[in-house]
Curated annotation (Swiss-Prot):
Belongs to the long (4 C-C) scorpion toxin superfamily. Sodium channel inhibitor family. Beta subfamily. The modification Lysine amide is found at K84. It holds the Pfam family Toxin_3. Disulfide bonds join C32-C83, C36-C58, C44-C64, C48-C66. This is Beta-mammal/insect toxin To1.
Length: 86
């Protein structure tokens, strides 16, 4: 029984450490946001899940916005914007 409680405690500890909180607009290799205006309804949800996010949608700027992604995922920022007007 003690081992079971220890196992459960470790599981929750690992879950808290690995918890993903990042959100934002997905960015491609060209530095531009993932466009979604002409894509199917579930396109952004699928792209966000590929990046290990929990959910996403086609946002106001007609780009994919994702929730709860790992910190390694690149997201768009006006300060680091490298998109050349595409």
């Amino acid at each position: 029984m003690t081992r079971f409680v220890l196992f459960i405690s470790c599981f929750f500890l690992i879950d808290m450490i690995v918890e993903c909180k990042k959100e934002g607009y997905l960015v491609g290799n060209d530095g531009c946001k993932y466009g979604c205006i002409t894509r199917p309804h579930q396109y952004c949800v699928h792209e966000c899940e590929l990046k290990k996010g929990t959910d996403g949608y086609c946002a106001y700027w007609l780009a994919c916005y994702c929730y709860n992604m790992p910190d390694w995922v690149k997201t768009w920022s006006s300060a680091t914007n490298k998109c050349k007007g595409k």
